[in-house]
Regions:
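Catalytic binding pocket for nucleotide-activated donors in carbohydrate/polymer assembly enzymes
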Residues: 41-49, 74-155
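A structural signal for isolated positions on well-ordered beta-strands in alpha/beta enzyme cores
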Residues: 22-24, 53, 90
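Active-site donor-binding acidic/aromatic loop of nucleotide-activated sugar
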Residues: 50-57
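Short beta-strand/turn micro-motifs composed of small residues
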Residues: 25-27, 72, 93
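C-terminal alpha-helical cap of glycosyltransferases
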Residues: 160-176
């Protein structure tokens, strides 16, 4: 698995914590299932740090609401987090997971790629030691990024604020 935690997780956590930032690690449930040793290593290395928190429960949401930003790779959580919560994202530029090796033949930029520079900033894995500067940059630009997120949300999220009224009607249509 080429995810953040499996490739640069420990280095990233150390860089964030060493700069005095609070860090909540919320691994994907597949990471919990497939590579528990990585998480045990993070727990062993950082559990005594007062600003480190590891959350393994997928039902816990409070940390998302309290957070200022998300750090991820190509995970879909970036779209949910940015468009759903209206908060910025820092993307670690790891190689994307490709499920369709012929995707480029379509001549369409994937939404996951298109949205990255609009809802946050991208940092190379080799630049992780400078993650604190990127965090501070994103936090200082939160208002600008939120304006862009709002525009994207209006363009791409249908029935925004009306799902409760529209959703059940559409489900009933499908059931007929």
């Amino acid at each position: 698995d080429q995810s953040i935690l499996n490739t640069i997780g420990s280095k990233l956590c150390k860089a964030i914590l060493d700069q005095g930032h609070t860090l909540t690690v919320r691994p994907h449930y597949e990471t919990v299932k497939r590579t528990p040793g990585v998480l045990q290593g993070l727990q062993a290395n950082f559990s005594d740090h007062p600003k480190f928190n590891l959350i393994l429960s997928m039902s816990e949401n409070e940390s998302l609401f309290r957070s200022q930003l998300l750090i991820t790779d190509w995970s879909g959580i970036s779209i949910e987090y940015s468009l759903g919560l209206g908060k910025p994202v820092i993307f670690i530029d790891l190689p994307p997971r490709v499920r369709n090796p012929k995707w480029q033949e379509l001549g369409i930029e994937p939404f996951e790629s298109w949205i990255r520079n609009k809802v946050g900033k991208i940092i190379l894995p080799d630049d992780i030691d400078g993650i604190s500067e990127k965090i501070n940059e994103v936090i200082s630009q939160t208002d600008q990024i939120m304006t862009e997120i709002k525009s994207i949300r209006e363009q791409w999220v249908y029935n925004l604020g009306q799902t409760r009224n529209v959703g059940p009607k559409e489900i009933i249509k499908l059931l007929k």
